Swiss-Prot record:
Further remarks about this protein from its record: Heme 1 (or BL or b562) is low-potential and absorbs at about 562 nm, and heme 2 (or BH or b566) is high-potential and absorbs at about 566 nm.
Annotated positions binding a ubiquinone: H201
Cysteine pairs bridged by disulfides in the record: none
Protein name: Cytochrome b
Cofactor: heme b
Organism: Halichoerus grypus
Family: Belongs to the cytochrome b family.
Amino acid sequence: MTNIRKTHPLMKIINNSFIDLPTPSNISAWWNFGSLLGICLILQILTGLFLAMHYTSDTTTAFSSVTHICRDVNYGWIIRYLHANGASMFFICLYMHVGRGLYYGSYTFTETWNIGIILLFTIMATAFMGYVLPWGQMSFWGATVITNLLSAIPYIGTDLVQWIWGGFSVDKATLTGFFAFHFILPFVVLALAAVHLLFLHETGSNNPSGIMPDSDKIPFHPYYTIKDILGALLLILVLTLLVLFSPDLLGDPDNYIPANPLSTPPHIKPEWYFLFAYAILRSIPNKLGGVLALVLSILILAIVPLLHTSKQRGMMFRPISQCLFWLLVADLLTLTWIGGQPVEHPYITIGQLASILYFMILLVLMPIASIIENNILKW
């Protein structure tokens, strides 16, 4: 009798993607983040669904509906904090996943990489809109500041901003629209993730050595399913500790003040996972220039495959590139710190230097380092 797992049209797809998938035998824990991102996405969709059952997207009741969820709904507080901190875990996994791709040269799978960039933009848009929904001070002013950036677009900017606002300021129409998009986009992300996997399985996974290991592959199950379960348990452990012991650690206290259009908070800043991009935005005095730098800080990933000058794929055997990579990581951490600081003397200069260094490493230093490494090896 033939195995249903290998013959049934639906089971066959699952089997070829998660069970009998030939996988390199040497992939490290850095390859765990794909499955962790899947878990985060499912968790966010489920907790979000239960929150949406009690949330009202109206400016007069949005803030109190979130309070109602935390106080009156059975286990509403844990659902709310799982959703809020789940977003933080999502972005930690995302940045690790992208960092892994940069380090090991996974960007040479251009289709997979480009879908990944689209996914990153979509998730960032979803998270931004989700932050607006509790309708606290930082929600309102964050929405005002970020949507207002579109007014820097020549000719159509002002009309575009008013179209997104649904009026002449951030108000009821904006909140309702953001809720609608925040609800639908995770399902778009789910579909894009399936396409991301589809393209990945066309080529097979990369591995730390960067060499195509067709002669040495093992089935995904049980070897990597058990490894992914360990990663998932660690993720759940960290998330649980965060939710149960310090749920507001990564949030902003200002968001516990209901939105007031007449009172601006002293420091308007986004959630921690956007601070690096926010620092790049603020480091350019010109509005349009800042917006372009903000978009390019992520879009620059799309040209990384074109700037790959090394004869080797990953950085495993390239010490100069490794140093530059970790300098880039340190630079991004510096930008994250700067993004959360007020616009004052030392911070402005540090932010500008860190922004220049960010683009310099990716556009100039890494390609040059690769050429130097090729010459050292006489390739």
